[in-house]
């Protein structure tokens, strides 16, 4: 495990340096934007073993970059700034921030939760690379496509398959019935998981980060850039925006930080054209800390949290079982080129941890140290995806091989191999099936019942 952890760190550094040199977004921006990070691709191919060629792909992907999903943080920041403005208690930087947030509200109007243009572009590019990098896979036989019922997931699927429409003119996106989204929205079908999310330990952990002395001190420093001292005094004591909403200084600053993250769903030209830039309000250390505070929710609810085999990870078992079965069927029948699935970060992250992909399943102690072992921007950026690419040999007596990629990056799995990043399919399948069998999941027909009972 220490070797895998070390190799992941070295690999992360190499990719990070390349991104820093060639990407319009800096490494610091990526590390502070968490699951809101726009998708980044770095070409990293390893030669296929001699005599082998790709013939099938099993895939699960997150929707592309989107507009802010709801107005909550927008409203908090805007209402507090307007209140300060009415009382002439904004600094020049505060006035500029109010102007920017007003612009953000206009950009988001009538688009909450929809894919942004950047998101659409990223999805299209991922599908083009899948087709171009795997010419022996796409023979025009059949592609199965399924999405969650979310409009942005369905649109992501439609954009993705447009690349393949010339080869597959009758290609359609299928959806499980609204009340049976057990493959892609399994997180909605487990009573134990619903209880887990409301767990006092999780709530208290998140609150302890939000109200930590470091959070309060940094929030005060940022507030001084925006408000007069009199207004900061009011904000420290709490300002009531509604019957159930009292906003303190750190709540306001965290809301602004959330908007900073959300801005990354827009392209750099759009940000420049609309004069949107929050960099003057946060230092690098403040960005890193608030990223830790905000992204902790992902780590605890859809990451390894306190137990990398806990209920928040177990619930992805039906999806893993489906991928195992569809892969076996493709190998046996040789009648399908790919299975493509489109869903959410809440789908991809638990699956990655369940598969024990490097960098996804290490438990941090204390929780506040989680960024050293689990980086949301590397695991579940916008348009995140896991691809299983299958290879067969010209010689019938040779084993089927599989390469797993997380966000188009080759990754280590919890098995030994002499041909990294290629693993023998029978060995990998056995490893995962044993894991599922130990949890009592052996038949797709009982998935809903299993999700209802699993603890």
PLM feature spans:
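Bacterial N-terminal signal peptides that target proteins for export
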Residues: 2-13
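Hydrophobic helical h-region of N-terminal Sec-dependent signal peptides
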Residues: 13-19
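N-terminal signal peptide c-region/cleavage motif recognized by signal peptidases
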Residues: 22-23
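Signature for phosphate-centric chemistry
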Residues: 29-144, 148-339, 343-455
